[in-house]
Regions:
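Conserved post-catalytic alpha-helical subdomain immediately downstream of the catalytic base
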Residues: 74-144
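Short linear functional motifs in flexible/disordered or boundary regions
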Residues: 15, 22, 52, 61, ...
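Short charge-dense sequence patches
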Residues: 48-50, 88-92, 151
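Conserved phosphate/ATP/ADP-binding segment of small-molecule kinases
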Residues: 1-72
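…primarily DNA-binding HTH/wHTH and HhH modules…
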Residues: 143, 147-151
């Protein structure tokens, strides 16, 4: 079983809060989210817990990353600085990226990198659909953040 949440879900729904983190101030403490993921896994029996981590610089500019707890190990994605065109669909794109990477047989680190890259790219597109190709996601996840159109 897999749990996908954002940095506020565990606190708002289950009362599990990350230590030394101020979501509204854009402060994310990785150690605190390790504890949140472990508590969710222990309490509900999840094998994997994925948590997106948004750090607000402004309403339109954020730092975006995520962590994946998988069988007692923790994996953190790289952090992207992104200008937001539309947030709608960003979480769905993260979940879709996580599922796609799992179905492709990716290892946990590559899985979380792929999911975050898919979501990051979606934030740059207006509307609810992520209109990027799997190749574009792979390139960004693999380190190509040049922003050059690859079509």
């Amino acid at each position: 079983d897999v749990c996908i949440a954002n940095e506020e879900d565990a606190a708002d729904v289950f009362g599990i809060k990350a230590a030394d983190t101020g979501v509204t101030a854009g402060e994310v403490n990785h150690e605190g989210y390790k504890d949140v993921a472990k508590q969710l896994a222990d309490r509900f029996g999840f094998e994997k817990v994925a948590i997106t981590l948004r750090e607000s610089l402004s309403a339109n500019d954020n730092l975006w990353s995520a962590m994946l707890y998988d069988t007692n190990d923790y994996y953190f994605s790289k952090k992207y600085k992104m200008h937001i065109v539309d947030r709608v669909g960003g979480g769905d794109s993260f979940g879709g990226g996580l599922i796609a990477a799992s179905l492709l047989g990716y290892q946990p680190q590559k899985t979380i990198e792929f999911a975050v890259a898919a979501s990051c790219l979606k934030h740059s597109i207006e509307g609810d659909f992520n209109m990027v190709s799997i190749e574009e996601v792979k390139k960004l996840a693999g380190g190509d953040a040049s922003g050059r159109v690859q079509r």
